[in-house]
């Protein structure tokens, strides 16, 4: 029995943190810790808000880190760089890809350069003045307002009037000290598609998110309030649209130099055009989260998905890419 335990991969499960998505992170980590195969893995928990010195001290005895941090210092390359310094491999993208995807403004520039369709937008740098009349003149109404570097729809709002635009910008600034994005609101169907792999990429089945009647879009409450939205996987869409979404998800993954896995969100507009919204490098990881649902639609259960992410992370560390 002792020999069997010695062969188990020693996993540092990193969660918590200090961002506004702390509780989401901890909930996901509870599920992952429960689901990880105890015959394969020996799991230790670390909260990045308090346990980084302990993680550094334990580095020599850790085989792999599973990151379940969201938002600031989790998805932006910070923890990835720390683990690189410690020589601990981890799942998902490295410093560069994580930082690019976390900065929604910069990511949209990369999408645009890769000829991927995006809604028009303006970015207001932290502390900069802006003219609401010019934003409305250039982009029209309604407008989506959100922090450029936050996740889980934190700080996001929909503005139908100039007054709502000003309130939305102030709200976003309350939620983030960084830049604010103002972009055209595209009314349509919300679709999302995950990608698995390092070099050989696989797009998973497309999932459609149908927010409840009280939600104009998939905001924080619609994401995490039970019953607030319906998720349909595989999405009931035409084959041509499904192929386009999967193609664009892979191209977004490549454009941002991502590794291991990602999930890209889209809107299929009422104008019949597909628009890319953003890419998430550490998607939610509860059993009912989108990525596990998409994996399940291919026949991959949650434990197998976790195994795959760990295997891809170990493969990435050997190749020293991303």
UniProtKB/Swiss-Prot annotation:
Pathway: Cell wall biogenesis; peptidoglycan biosynthesis. Pfam families: Dala_Dala_lig_C (PF07478), Dala_Dala_lig_N (PF01820). ATP binds at residues 136-192. The keyword Ligase applies. SUPFAM superfamilies: Glutathione synthetase ATP-binding domain-like (SSF56059), PreATP-grasp domain (SSF52440). Coiled coil: none annotated. InterPro entries: ATP-grasp, ATP_grasp_subdomain_1, D-Ala_lig_Van_CS, D_ala_D_ala, Dala_Dala_lig_C, Dala_Dala_lig_N, PreATP-grasp_dom_sf. One of its GO terms (biological process) is peptidoglycan biosynthetic process. Its cofactor is Mg(2+); Mn(2+). Mg(2+) 1 binds at residues 265, 278. Gene3D superfamilies: 3.40.50.20, ATP-grasp fold, A domain (3.30.1490.20), ATP-grasp fold, B domain (3.30.470.20). Keywords: ATP-binding, Cell shape, Cell wall biogenesis/degradation, Cytoplasm, Ligase, Magnesium, Manganese, Metal-binding, Nucleotide-binding, Peptidoglycan synthesis. Binds 2 magnesium or manganese ions per subunit. Residues 108-311 form the ATP-grasp domain. It is found in: Cytoplasm. Its EC number is 6.3.2.4. It comes from the Bacteria. GO terms for molecular function: ATP binding; D-alanine-D-alanine ligase activity; metal ion binding. Cell wall formation. Belongs to the D-alanine--D-alanine ligase family. This is D-alanine--D-alanine ligase. It comes from Desulfotalea psychrophila (strain LSv54 / DSM 12343).
């Amino acid at each position: 029995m002792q020999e069997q335990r010695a062969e188990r991969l020693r996993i540092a499960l990193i969660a918590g943190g200090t961002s506004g998505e702390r509780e989401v992170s901890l909930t996901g980590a509870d599920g992952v810790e429960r689901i990880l195969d105890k015959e394969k893995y020996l799991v230790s928990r670390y909260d990045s808000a308090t346990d980084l010195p302990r993680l550094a001290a334990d580095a020599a005895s850790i085989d792999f880190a599973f990151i379940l941090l969201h938002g600031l210092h989790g998805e932006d390359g910070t923890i990835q760089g720390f683990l690189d310094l410690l020589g601990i491999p981890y799942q998902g993208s490295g410093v560069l890809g994580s930082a690019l995807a976390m900065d929604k403004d910069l990511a949209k520039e990369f999408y645009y350069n890769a000829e991927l369709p995006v809604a028009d937008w303006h970015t207001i740098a932290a502390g900069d003045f802006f003219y609401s009349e010019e934003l409305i003149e250039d982009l029209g109404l309604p407008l989506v307002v959100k922090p450029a570097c936050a996740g889980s729809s934190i700080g996001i709002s929909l503005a139908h009037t100039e007054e709502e635009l000003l309130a939305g910008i102030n709200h976003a600034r309350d939620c983030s000290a960084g830049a604010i994005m103002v972009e055209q609101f595209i009314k349509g169907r919300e679709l999302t598609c995950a990608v698995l792999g390092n070099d050989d990429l696989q797009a998973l089945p497309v999932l459609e998110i149908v927010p409840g009647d009280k939600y104009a879009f998939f905001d924080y409450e619609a994401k995490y309030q039970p019953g607030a939205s319906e998720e349909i996987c595989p999405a009931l869409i035409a084959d041509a649209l499904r192929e386009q979404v999967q193609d664009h998800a892979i191209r977004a993954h490549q454009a941002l130099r991502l590794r291991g896995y990602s999930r890209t969100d889209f809107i299929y507009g009422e104008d019949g055009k597909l628009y890319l919204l953003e890419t998430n490098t550490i998607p939610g990881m509860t059993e009912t989260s989108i990525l596990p649902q998409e994996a399940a639609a291919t026949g991959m259960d949650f434990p197998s998905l976790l195994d795959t992410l760990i295997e891809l992370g170990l493969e990435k560390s050997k190749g020293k890419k991303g």
